[in-house]
A protein has these predicted regions:
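Phosphate-handling active-site elements
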Residues: 51-60, 135-145
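Active-site/ligand-binding-proximal alpha/beta "capping" segment
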Residues: 2-37, 92, 103-119
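A short, acidic, amphipathic alpha-helical segment used as a generic capping/interface helix at domain edges
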Residues: 106, 113, 129-138
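Short glycine/serine/threonine-rich phosphate/pyrophosphate-binding segments
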Residues: 35-46, 124-132, 157
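ATP/nucleoside-binding phosphotransfer catalytic cores, i.e., glycine-rich phosphate-binding loops
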Residues: 115, 143-162
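Active-site/ligand-binding loops adjacent to catalytic centers
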Residues: 50-123, 161-199
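Glycine-rich beta-alpha junction loops
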Residues: 5-8, 37-40, 62-67, 73, ...
Length: 199
């Protein structure tokens, strides 16, 4: 199958997921946010959305240490998103903005969202959600409609993401800190790579 090189990967999302999001939002979507891994999902959906409305902002959420948000690959803890190479299935022209997300922000956002919404999500979901929250902070349009793709379950991360002891051992949670103490608004927006589509 080779999802990193198979053109059917983005094509499937351009043919199905993109049209579904457009229909479900009645064409009112203004921002689409997703993690970048193979790049197939964000490429396919982003292409479709830009074909419908070039003003839709496609935001790629990328772990700090991955190559998509710039720089060379470095180790990071977030699983299921980011890469240390450029997949053939990722169209670098699709994302209008790429937000770099730290492991701490990804993990703790996922934990807090799970507690608040009852959705057992993995850390790649936390990556996308944190990026969406940060971009939403900079948007003054009251009619803005964000769609955030949350692709993984936290079921496989119970001993890691959902373990305070593990988070502390990884340096993501201070000794005397609780997950509930984390405030995503207190974190400054990480490096953002923006594309000027007016040129």
């Amino acid at each position: 199958m080779d999802q990193y090189h198979n053109p059917a990967n983005p094509a499937a999302h351009e043919a199905s997921t993109g049209p579904e999001l457009w229909a479900q939002t009645a064409g009112r979507i203004t921002h689409f946010v997703a993690g970048v891994g193979t790049g197939g999902t964000i490429t396919g959906i982003g292409r479709y959305l830009h074909e419908q409305n070039a003003a839709v902002v496609v935001v790629g959420a990328d772990p700090a240490g991955s190559v998509f948000s710039g720089g060379s690959a470095q180790p990071y803890l977030t699983e299921g998103v980011g890469e240390d190479f450029w997949p053939a299935t990722y169209d670098t022209d699709v994302c209008d903005t790429i937000v770099r997300v730290s492991d701490r922000d990804a993990f703790l956002t996922a934990r807090q969202a799970t507690a608040a919404e009852g959705i057992l999500m993995g850390e790649s979901c936390g990556t996308a959600l944190w990026a969406a929250l940060q971009v939403a902070r900079t948007t003054d349009d009251p009619a803005a409609l964000f769609v955030v793709l949350l692709p993984d379950s936290g079921r496989n991360y119970v001993g890691k993401l959902y373990s305070d002891a593990w988070l502390r051992s990884a340096g993501l949670l201070a000794t005397d800190e609780q997950v509930a103490d984390y405030d995503w608004r207190a974190t400054q927006l990480g490096p953002v790579v923006q594309r000027d589509r007016t040129a």
